[in-house]
């Protein structure tokens, strides 16, 4: 495409979304597989202190959200903390954030697809169906962000309505024995590990920050959307946790791979749980693919990933190549990861991403801050503690992937790429 003067025009992203659209896309990313799968490993880790883990994860998520909103107001561009980190801290911290987001969220997407399939088909069909779901939703994302936003609105509305009915049915069904409600106390480390695993369920608000080039009036809309979205999700997760503890107890949650389905039992509401889980997982997967693709595009613009991934499709205004590569990477993880491994691996990458987010926000000048410096410092410290508390397999896998990423960037710089 060229101008009348014969100059080549490079297609770019377009500002088509309002605050409501951004909130819905963020909710679609947060009300996902975490609601239906993260409580089990978190209850196994935290035991009777599951609610303490939830409060801790919520507090750190709040600090991260404030830092994300503050940075988005100053740097309304695609890439989220990858872009913010480069501007505030320099290219290497920015790369670490971007790599953490791409790797961690790719694992999140694999977890979403596996959760969707787990709730809809028998065991032998889980991975094939998860593969098909990824292929279809990558295709939807490639058609444009307005289609992504429309799909998110439908999915989020349906999931919230279904969950309201399911929670009422569960509460009417009875209560857990006192010893199941009390559970076992696994100590401070268990609380921290539980919070780290539950953080997987909150981290979708990062998707809103990656919309910097597609939201109208981003300096105002993105901070508002992040705050509204996180507030809704914290209330929802607290309600679900309280209901599950009341009906199953923390011991019962830890023993069930599908705690909401177990709480419903064989009642008429079981299909509603399955439909809600499927829709929520698909909604999160839809939002994740778009967010990862845009961060990969931003990294490719700076030569931190292959330059070809920076291309924007002239008709659909989407980073088509980046999203296709992201889709392929998700399929690889589905082939080799189980759900629990994907959740732990995702938490590692995303917590590192938010560690850089909080440090960047704390370094901003006073006139750019939306909150006190100590909030960013506390958020960074919280992320560091939760990373160190994750399961050993997640920590080792995360360190290996970051070593690969840092080696890749160092090699590109040395070769002049």
Which residue ranges define each predicted feature?
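A generic transmembrane alpha-helix motif of multi-pass inner-membrane proteins
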Residues: 349, 362-417
């Amino acid at each position: 495409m060229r101008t009348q003067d014969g100059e080549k025009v490079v297609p770019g992203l377009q500002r088509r979304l309002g605050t409501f659209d951004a909130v819905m896309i963020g909710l679609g990313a947060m009300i996902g597989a975490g609601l239906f799968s993260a409580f089990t490993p978190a209850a196994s880790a935290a035991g009777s202190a599951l609610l303490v883990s939830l409060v801790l994860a919520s507090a750190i998520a709040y600090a991260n959200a404030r830092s994300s909103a503050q940075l988005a107001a100053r740097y309304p561009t695609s890439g989220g903390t990858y872009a913010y980190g480069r501007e505030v801290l320099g290219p290497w911290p920015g790369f670490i954030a971007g790599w953490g987001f791409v790797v961690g969220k790719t694992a999140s997407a694999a977890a979403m697809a596996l959760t969707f399939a787990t709730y809809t088909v028998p065991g032998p069909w889980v991975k094939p169906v998860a593969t098909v779901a990824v292929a279809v939703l990558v295709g939807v994302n490639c058609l444009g962000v307005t289609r992504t936003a429309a799909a998110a609105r439908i999915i989020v509305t349906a999931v919230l309505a279904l969950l309201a009915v399911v929670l009422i049915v569960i509460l009417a069904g009875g209560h857990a024995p006192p010893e199941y409600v009390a559970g076992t106390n696994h100590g401070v480390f268990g609380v921290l590990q539980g919070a780290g695993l539950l953080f997987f369920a909150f981290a979708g608000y990062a998707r809103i920050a990656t919309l910097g080039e597609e939201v109208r009036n981003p300096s105002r809309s993105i901070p508002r959307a992040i705050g509204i979205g996180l507030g809704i999700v914290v209330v929802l997760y607290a309600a679900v946790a309280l209901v599950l503890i009341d009906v199953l107890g923390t011991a019962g949650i830890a023993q069930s791979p599908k705690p909401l389905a177990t709480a419903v039992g064989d009642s008429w509401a079981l299909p509603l749980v399955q439909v809600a889980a499927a829709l929520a997982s698909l909604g999160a997967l839809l939002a994740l693919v778009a967010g990862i693709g845009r961060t990969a595009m931003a990294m490719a613009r700076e030569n931190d990933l292959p330059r070809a991934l920076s291309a924007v499709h002239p008709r659909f205004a989407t980073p088509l190549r980046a999203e296709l590569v992201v889709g392929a990477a998700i399929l690889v993880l589905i082939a080799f990861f189980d759900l629990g491994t994907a959740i732990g691996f995702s938490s590692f990458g995303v917590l590192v991403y938010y560690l850089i987010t909080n440090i960047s926000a704390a370094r901003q000048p006073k006139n750019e801050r939306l909150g006190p410096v100590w909030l960013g410092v506390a958020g960074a410290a919280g992320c560091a503690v939760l990373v160190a508390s994750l399961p050993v397999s997640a920590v080792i896998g995360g360190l290996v992937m970051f070593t690969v990423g840092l080696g890749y960037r160092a090699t590109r710089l040395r070769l002049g790429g």
